[in-house]
Amino acid sequence: EKRSRRCLENRMTGFKIVNLKLLVEEIGEEETKTLLSNFSCPLNEDVEEFLRIKAIEFSKQGLAQTHLIFASYRGKLTLAGYFSLANKYITVKSNIVKGKLRQRINRFAVFDQQAKSYCLSAPLIAQLGKNFAVKPSLISGDELLELACEKISTIQLDLGGKFAYLECED
């Protein structure tokens, strides 16, 4: 079976990860916006608003890349959730880290003598959201986070790196 480059079959059975930018290229912006309009996350309106309104523009500008997660529901692929990744620079003051932690950070970071801090680049999981418009839920939060982490591992296999950054709310 020949697959489009925009779609990767994931190791976790039943999920397909689709890069939003490639989806827009394939089916067009209007059809993509229609698809995204079916996403609902009443627990966090920012997560819903980002996907519906900002994700395509962020993708075009290269600020963040969004990955849509689809699962089979009643015989068709349905949007189960998404995650967005961006590149983040993390600054760690040298007086905060000691001993072995300092040695570990020193292997992966650049030390800024003037600022007396370490700077390291890490992928940021900037957005993570489940689609509550579909009952029952097609993906758990743990599965969604695992998919995002697998994607980061794949990226770091090519680019290097050992850290990831997650912004979250309880």
Where would I find each of the regions flagged by the language model?
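Non-catalytic substrate-recognition and accessory regions of acyl/acetyltransferase enzymes
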Residues: 1-136, 143-169
